[in-house]
């Protein structure tokens, strides 16, 4: 894990770093030097691939993946990793699926929002799900808007459909 692309994250420091993969690393993307320069870097004579994942390292060496840097929500100067919040929302026994994303906000740049679907027969509402999650995060990490939907929007391959989810929250 490299926080600034030049040195390793100190275990137990709480620093967030980019996951870098060494070893057999490609020379670059075909006819895309800009993307190649962002993804493949040489540090101290070794070549690394930076795939976009962010993580921390615990004092015992355990790596905690936080999520994709490109999905990170900057809200009032604080960084929120949606995948981390989604997993916490899904800890509620009634929540079947969840997506968290940023929506534009005049005051904070972005605000955290999300959608959840409830298990069949479940009766939880958005407030109950948020209350159960509140003890796990700082207030800026929690969705300011959380909408309960019949099905969380996903592509046929299971990937999150953030565009559709944002549209649901923008126009409930």
Describe each model-derived feature in a short phrase.
Residues 1-40, 78-80:
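Conserved ATP/PPi-binding loop(s) of AMP-dependent carboxylate-activating enzymes
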Residues 159-172:
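Phosphopantetheine-dependent thiolation modules in NRPS/PKS and related acyl-activating systems
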Residues 1, 101-103, 149:
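Conserved beta-strand termini and adjacent loop/short-helix elements that scaffold enzyme active sites
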Residues 2-6, 45, 59-60, 94, ...:
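Residue-level recognition of short loop/turn positions
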Residues 22, 27-28, 38, 47, ...:
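AMP-binding/adenylate-forming catalytic core of the ANL superfamily
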Residues 135-159:
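AMP-binding/adenylate-forming catalytic domain of the ANL superfamily
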Residues 7, 63-65, 160:
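Hydrophobic "anchor" residues
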């Amino acid at each position: 894990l490299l926080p600034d692309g030049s040195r390793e994250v100190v275990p137990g420091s709480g620093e967030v770093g980019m996951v870098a993969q060494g070893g057999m690393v490609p020379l670059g993307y075909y006819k895309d030097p800009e993307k190649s320069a962002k993804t493949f870097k040489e540090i101290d004579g070794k070549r690394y691939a930076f795939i976009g994942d962010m993580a921390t390292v615990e004092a015992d060496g355990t790596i905690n993946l936080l999520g994709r840097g490109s999905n990170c929500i900057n809200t009032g100067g604080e960084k929120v990793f949606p995948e981390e919040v989604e997993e916490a929302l899904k800890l509620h026994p009634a929540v079947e699926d969840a997506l968290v994303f940023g929506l534009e906000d005049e005051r904070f740049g972005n605000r955290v929002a999300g959608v959840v679907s409830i298990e069949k027969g479940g009766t939880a509402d958005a407030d109950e799900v948020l209350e159960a999650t509140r003890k796990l995060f700082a207030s800026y990490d929690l969705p300011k808007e959380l909408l309960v939907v019949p099905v969380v929007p996903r592509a046929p391959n299971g990937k999150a459909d953030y565009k559709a989810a944002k549209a649901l929250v923008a126009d409930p």
